[in-house]
Amino acid sequence: MLILVSVVLKNKLGFIFTAFSLFALGFYMASSSNLKINIKNPVFLECKVISFPEKYYKNFLSDCKVLNSNNKNLINKEVKLISNKKLFFLSNVYILGKASIKHNKIFVKVVNLKEEKNKFLSPILSFRDYLIKNFKENSLNYISFSIGNALIFGDRSYIPQNIKKAFINTGLIHLLAISGLHIGLLIFILLFIFSFWDKRKSYLITILFLIFYPVITAFHIPVFRASLMGILYLYGKFKYLAINPMNILFFVAFISALIYPEVIFSVGFQLSFIAVFGLILSRKYIEIDIKNKFLKFFITSMLLSFFAVLWTTPLIIFYFHQFSPTSIFATTFEMFLLIPYLFLSVLNMFSLFLIKPLINIMDFIGLKFIELAKLFDSLKIMASNLDLNLIEVLTYYILLGFITINSKIKIIYKYILFFILFSFLFVMSKI
């Protein structure tokens, strides 16, 4: 229905309806899909590893696309391999194991396996392992290594559960996942580091870094997506082209879905996409003209957090049934630690994590980053047992989009309407 409406409407409003139509499909599929497969053990699998290994209790967990199996129901399915061995990304593996279904996902406990490593990627991934090894050896302690492993290499599996819980309770868990925010900060940092050269050279070096960075961060789809957006944006700058961020966003979403069609059903993809989509639509409310750079940074960060929360909260309630208003102001304060941390992480990457004092300064900031999250968690500001249905979510987004793009409404009245709409969201979620 929404798709038909979007054809009739024109310009931005039709554009918004098209986006929400796609999300409606993703919401429906993500919330209603129920895996039903008859599995007989043991299973024999030939599959391709499509993720980097993550720590899973005393073993490692890897995603794998099944190419062939004695159980025909598993062919072309994605399974999670539990193994005591780290499997290389894009390796072909032959497995004997025991399969089970948990949380609507297929898990295979590996009994025996043979691995054929990808000849092209193997040396690159070995270099990634070399950097992680150097970082671990020179890090202050396990906690500082675990936070760095998440913020630099994209692996949150080493972070202790109590620390993860503090970030979840405060709505700051997105800061532990490398996403558009981190890539944006890295672009800013790299352009600053190479600002002594002319702009075109600094753009080119940053593009080369963004091409390589997804390998360092385990080819996580959010990193690939954000890096591709950054590359296209910088390439436009390099070639003096007119840049439309919305076009770049939808092009990258299309490429992501083309490479990995299931991504449209991913909650992470939906949250990331709607956040960037909302920030692009709301950017005229975020860009403020203040001469004091510190004050401008602080207010801009608060506005970014506010609009990101405004656009993502319905999805968070829809999927997780909880919300922490702490994230609106907590994100801003954490940014004051995240920026120097990422700045030092770039220097450490260039020095191959061999300069211990430089790593330890970064570790110190990382530990303060955790302490601040725990401080906000101690405030215990959390709304739980919330519930929204798909119609309510879509109605909210249509109204929010209409208020945002309507040029006839004065800005002060828009903020009042934003507040009323946001408050109404919680009234609906409690009914």
Residue ranges and their predicted role:
Residues 40-56, 62, 97:
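Structural detector for short beta-strands of small beta-barrel domains
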Residues 106-229, 234-235, 382:
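Aromatic-rich juxtamembrane segments at the membrane interface
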Residues 60-69:
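A short beta-strand signature
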Residues 70-89:
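Beta-strand/loop nucleic-acid-binding surfaces
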Residues 88-91, 267:
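Short, flexible surface segments
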Residues 18-21, 205-212, 249-253, 414-424:
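Central hydrophobic cores of alpha-helical transmembrane segments
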